[in-house]
């Protein structure tokens, strides 16, 4: 989540120089092997263990997340509109800011993020569960999606409305931030891994994670180093990773899968030590439970900053400082929201 906030600072409030800086590109490249892939993998993994794993439950979750996406877009637009016009009232309109305002407003109303992807993936999982697809079917589907993704992104239409649908499904033009079809691979593999780990006896899970984490960690390093060698400059490496992050091919899926299993293994290994550190463990549990709220809110905070700043092009140092401020502000907003909702629930009782 911390890395996401830093990257989004460059993607929302940075000037052209900062957005093209090596700092942004390196941050993005380091985040790329996991990031949204890890989130979707964990979603598939968690669907194995949740009590709400029936197809109807998944449909309900999927629809709810799609509604969240729409509400988030409206809230982001409201943040831009309100903050931009407050700025105009205070200082007058900044030259050239109106065009940036209109472009960014259109962007936040039409782009899709992790909520849309998760919602669509839940609906697909519901279909698979309803059809009682075997475990091998999930693996085959993950491979097929990884093979097809580089080709399906070529589906582009001259019709703006149709192209928007194609873009957020397959990722052709890259104007909607994310697209859901290529990410199905991670959801399918997460589901498969959840089924596998469920069959491993509790007293053997440590050894299982140790072996699988070691093998997958080595493969992930080889893959990542191979990507660097085959794209030997920061710019080429960033461009390649950007394309692969949005519309991952089979090799990227395999590399990220190995990186994610390594992360799972490390987390399993260090968790007993983390549990002894009560403050850190409680914070980790808090962020795990509230990550969706933090993800949704921090983007709105960035757009509020952008609007109030009249879309001033911040430099690298300023983006990094704003990222820290947004992290703190987001945490405070989520805590405030939780206190208010808890108070309302208590009063109802």
Question: Where do the model's predicted regions map?
Answer:
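Alpha-helical transmembrane segments and their immediate juxtamembrane cytosolic regions
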Residues: 1-349
């Amino acid at each position: 989540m911390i890395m996401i906030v830093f990257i989004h600072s460059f993607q929302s409030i940075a000037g052209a120089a900062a957005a093209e800086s090596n700092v942004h590109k390196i941050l993005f490249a380091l985040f790329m092997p996991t990031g949204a892939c890890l989130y979707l993998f964990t979603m598939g993994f968690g669907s194995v263990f949740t009590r709400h794993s029936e197809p109807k439950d998944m449909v309900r979750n999927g629809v709810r997340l799609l509604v969240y996406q729409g509400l988030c877009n409206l809230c982001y637009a409201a943040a831009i509109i309100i903050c931009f016009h407050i700025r105009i009232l205070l200082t007058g309109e900044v030259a050239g800011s109106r065009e940036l305002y209109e472009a960014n407003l259109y962007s936040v109303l039409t782009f899709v993020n992790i909520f849309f992807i998760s919602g669509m993936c839940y609906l697909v999982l519901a279909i698979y569960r309803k059809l009682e697809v075997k475990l091998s079917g999930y693996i085959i589907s993950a491979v097929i999606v990884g093979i097809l993704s580089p080709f399906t992104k070529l589906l582009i239409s001259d019709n703006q409305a149709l192209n928007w649908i194609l873009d957020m499904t397959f990722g052709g033009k890259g104007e909607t931030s994310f697209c859901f079809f290529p990410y199905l691979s991670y959801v399918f593999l997460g589901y498969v891994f959840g089924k596998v780990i469920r069959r491993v006896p509790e007293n053997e899970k440590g050894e299982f994670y140790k072996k699988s984490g070691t093998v997958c960690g080595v493969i992930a390093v080889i893959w990542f180093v191979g990507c660097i060698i085959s794209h030997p400059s920061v710019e080429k490496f960033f461009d390649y990773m950007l394309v692969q992050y949005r519309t991952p091919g089979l090799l990227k899926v395999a590399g990220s899968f190995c990186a994610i299993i390594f992360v799972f293994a490390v987390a399993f290994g260090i968790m007993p030590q983390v549990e002894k550190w009560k403050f850190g463990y409680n914070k980790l549990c808090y962020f795990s439970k509230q990550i969706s709220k933090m993800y949704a809110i921090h983007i709105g905070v960035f757009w509020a900053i952008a609007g109030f700043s009249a879309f001033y092009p911040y430099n690298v140092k300023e983006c990094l400082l704003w990222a820290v401020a947004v992290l703190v502000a987001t945490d405070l907003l989520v805590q405030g929201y939780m206190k208010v909702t808890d108070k309302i629930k208590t009063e109802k009782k």
